[in-house]
Amino acid sequence: MAGTEFAFLYFLQSLHTPWLDSAMVFISSLGDHGRFFLLLAVILLLFKKTRTMGAAMLFSMLLGFLIGNLWLKNMFMRQRPCWLDPTVDLLVRVPRDYSFPSGHTLIGFECAVSIWLQNRRAGAAMLAFAFLLAFSRMYLFVHFPTDVLAGAVLGSVIAWVVYRLMREIEKRRQL
């Protein structure tokens, strides 16, 4: 599997252009430390119409951080591609934490699916962004394809579970 994943990452390295490099660095930076997504969730919390969406995002991010970043990364301790092949010139700083699952992809899909479950149009735009964010992590040679796949699946599942729990709580409050 690692050979196939490296082959794909090396193919992505062959696509580099100055414009695409800048775009991927910028897109990836929006996922750094979850700041963009935290800000978006807080903004959504400010308005009654989007408050539930913002709360779902925050709960999903918290759960994802605990499961993905604190538990799974340290359980699997998967080396990053840039650690295994340091000959590839990186456009970003070498990450210090483990690779699996991708935290950027995890938070991107948690938030995108949280929005999509409540607003299909806005959610579709956020899903497109989440896919770009996931792609940027492979393009930048800091994640394997299975890292971003796991982040996308886990983030989507977490968002769906949080959404279902919030709906169930809301139903019980109305009884």
Where in this protein do the model-derived segments appear?
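Interfacial segments of alpha-helical transmembrane regions
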Residues: 40-66
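Membrane-embedded catalytic cores of phosphoryl/pyrophosphoryl-handling enzymes
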Residues: 89-175
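Membrane-water interface at transmembrane helix exits
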Residues: 44, 68, 72-77, 116, ...
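Alpha-helical transmembrane segments in multi-pass membrane proteins
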Residues: 56, 60-65, 69, 151, ...
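Membrane-helix interface segments
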Residues: 19-20, 34, 49-54, 118-125
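Small-polar-interrupted transmembrane alpha-helices in polytopic inner-membrane proteins
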Residues: 59-73, 124-137
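Hydrophobic, aromatic-rich transmembrane alpha-helices
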Residues: 37-48, 108-114
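N-terminal transmembrane-helix/juxtamembrane module of multi-pass inner/ER membrane proteins
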Residues: 1-35, 69-97, 173-175
